[in-house]
Amino acid sequence: MFTREAIRHCRQCGASVAYRLPDDGDTKERAICTACHTVHYENPLNVVGTVPHWGEQVLLCKRNIEPRKGKWTLPAGFMELGESTSEGAARETTEEAGAQFVMEDLLTVMSVPRVGQVHLYYRARLTSDVFDPGHETMEARLFTEAEIPWDELAFRTVKETLEHYFADRRAGQFGTHAFDIA
């Protein structure tokens, strides 16, 4: 099971916290402030991105940052506070690929408990095949399914998402696929 570094101080008042069962009947130990009694919940992080497509091709980005620097990925990253999942996916696509696109429907939702994350990918119809990648991307390039460097993909979530995208495309109907990644 994934665990982050333990919370040591209350975000509300700065006092120390103790891990214990809350008094409200919760069955999981939580970080509880010893002074103001604020309960601090530790939740998964959301990773949001897109499958940008142009005709028969999808857009992949070669990572210029760790982890997996030099590997290919879909444009994606951590969701920011104050944005919806689709807004975050659009922002990441703009930042990483410099692409022009129209957001479409949700394609995959993947729980990745071993790293404390949930990954959500939307389809995005490209409106141009000209890209201006940001500093996190070495190269942004279009690939057909046959051209994708499957052994050079950065993350299993990217591979699974691309497999669902192309299977749905062949079937002529897109759905939303929700599953766990062990």
Regions found by a protein language model. Give the residues of each.
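Unchanged
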Residues: 79-102, 106-164, 168, 173-174, ...
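Conserved hydrophobic/aromatic beta-strand scaffold that supports enzyme active sites
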Residues: 9-12, 30, 51, 60, ...
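Conserved Nudix-box catalytic region and its N-terminal flanking loop in Nudix hydrolases
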Residues: 53-95
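Short connector loops at helix/strand junctions that flank enzyme active sites
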Residues: 28, 45-47, 53, 67-69, ...
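Short glycine-/acidic-enriched loop or helix-start segments at secondary-structure transitions
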Residues: 22, 70, 152
